[in-house]
Amino acid sequence: MDLDVFVTAHRAEWDRLDALLGRQRRLTGAEADELVALYQRTATHLSLIQSSAPDPQLTGRLSQLVARARSAVTGTRRASWRDVTRFLAHGFPAAVYRSRHWWVPTALLSTLVAALLGWWIGTHPEVQATIAAPSELRELTRPGGQYETYYSSHPAASFAAQVWTNNAWAAALCLILGVFLGLPVLWILFQNMLNLGVGFGLMSSAGRLDTFLGLVLPHGLLELTAVFVAAGTGLRLGWTLIDPGPRTRRIALAEEGRAAIGMAIGLALVLFVSGAIEGFVTPSGLPTWARITIGVVAELAFLAYVYVLGGRAARAGETGDLDAAERSAAVPTAA
């Protein structure tokens, strides 16, 4: 395509569309119809230029023109309760379900790493000595020690809010940093598993493994699952850069990135639940079996939510991405 000839042939249409968009007064019916027609044609022109003769300056101008025209034609779309319901019932669980081949292996391998670290620390006193002095370790692991009082030393509401904020930020980092080929995600995962392994090893070496499990399992099952989902999705996003499949790398990254943003919101809600459990249930006076039961029920409910609702939505074609009309990266074309 001869770009100069193309621009000469259609410049008048683009200028006319720009003029209509700049009108201060309300458009007449005929002008509104003209605006819609020019919007469709300009969107088609933009698509042609992007595919056959990309020119950064011209593409930028037409992209802005099409965006302004789209806003004028469709109006600014506001999120509704229907959108929220659709996201929670279809979009988010489907996105988690679609990523299961990444986060389930991530969860299994990470748990294995934490268990091995815990065994290594618990059976090697010389390793424990590098963590803290013997007196400090005794203070940490004794009945009523720092490990137990950590969950009850602050008001439940403020502690739950702090935990939720920290965990939501960690999950968001896993999703965001996935674009760096997943390497930062692996480091975040290792840090989390190391912390878990240290607690496991020290408490088991002190003969208090039952106390450790009673403190970690109520909130930890759901919390760690959310972290594993975020990490697995981040790794998937990183792999998309390496192997985008049948899609172009740009389109694949845009689609997976938008889905990841939605997952960050959904996982923040999941972590809110685990944070509430950690703040109010874990330090409560409930029997250990009751606290663990609450954690198991919350975990099973989340898995059912993902595999039942999410699986059904995914099989129906839901991906967790935005609707086509809402994708800023998509360019409408004339029918």
PLM features per residue range, with description:
Residues 89, 130-173, 196, 204-206, ...:
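Interfacial loop/helix-cap signal at membrane boundaries in integral membrane proteins
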Residues 83-100, 149-150, 154, 158, ...:
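Cytosolic juxtamembrane amphipathic/interface segments immediately preceding
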Residues 112-117, 185-208:
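Small-polar-interrupted transmembrane alpha-helices in polytopic inner-membrane proteins
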Residues 316-335:
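Short, highly charged, low-complexity non-transmembrane loops/tails of multi-pass membrane proteins
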Residues 78, 95-107:
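Membrane-interface helix starts
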Residues 63, 119-145, 190:
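Interfacial/capping segments of alpha-helical transmembrane domains
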Residues 1-85:
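Soluble N-terminal domains of membrane-associated systems
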Residues 197-288, 292, 297-299:
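Hydrophobic alpha-helical transmembrane segments and adjacent short intramembrane/lumenal linkers
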